[in-house]
Amino acid sequence: MFLYTENFDEQKEKAMEGLRKALEEDKVDHDIIPLLEKINALQNYFTTSSCSGRISVMEMPHFGDKVNSVWLGKWHREVRLEEVLEAVGKHRSGQLWFLVRSPILHVGARTLEDAVRLLNLAIGLGFKYSNIKSVSHKKLVVEIRSTERMDVPLGENGELWVDEAYIEKIVNLANAQVRRFKGKLKRLEEEIEKLQED
């Protein structure tokens, strides 16, 4: 027997303790909570981390430097042009980026067979970048990810390279992506109980 299978119940208990704490501290995206509850109610799965997807405006010293980056605006929903313009107006230094990130969930599975069942369900529902993230002695983790993503440079060192009309266009595109991935999350929430053992 694989150690991750032997350790499953202990790892799930630890993860549920972490989730309870995160919920108490309001650190969980509200619209993904029903899905997390359904996954965690399944005997052979548990969630370790999640994000319901987001639109953001970020200031980076240089591209890829996440450690020293600053959020100027972050939304786990559709966004209004005015909100984005307000965030853009805070830009002072470094590079200014408009970003969209699809939902991501990390789910522990009891066995490799369980992991593959979840992976096949997720991919079938449009989470095309889903994969088995890690297999270690402690746990077996499936990463559920979709394809929606935008990385749009807007300016640098306080200078804006684009006008408001352009920002309005990318906000509309971003909101369309949000609607798409929120729909996928809803379908996953509706279908996840198929993984319940009889």
Swiss-Prot record:
Coiled-coil features, chain-numbered ranges: none
Organism: Thermococcus kodakarensis (strain ATCC BAA-918 / JCM 12380 / KOD1)
Similarity comment text for this entry: Belongs to the TYW3 family.
Pfam families: TYW3
Keywords in alphabetical order: Methyltransferase, S-adenosyl-L-methionine, Transferase, tRNA processing
MF terms in GO: tRNA methyltransferase activity
Enzyme class (EC, first level): transferase
One BP annotation, GO: wybutosine biosynthetic process
Keyword Magnesium included in the entry's annotation: no
Keyword S-adenosyl-L-methionine annotated: yes
Stated name of the protein: tRNA(Phe) 7-((3-amino-3-carboxypropyl)-4-demethylwyosine(37)-N(4))-methyltransferase 1
Signal sequence coordinates: none
Catalytic reaction annotation: 4-demethyl-7-[(3S)-3-amino-3-carboxypropyl]wyosine(37) in tRNA(Phe) + S-adenosyl-L-methionine = 7-[(3S)-3-amino-3-carboxypropyl]wyosine(37) in tRNA(Phe) + S-adenosyl-L-homocysteine + H(+)
Function: S-adenosyl-L-methionine-dependent methyltransferase that acts as a component of the wyosine derivatives biosynthesis pathway.
Domain of life from the UniProt record: Archaea
Enzyme nomenclature, EC number: 2.1.1.282
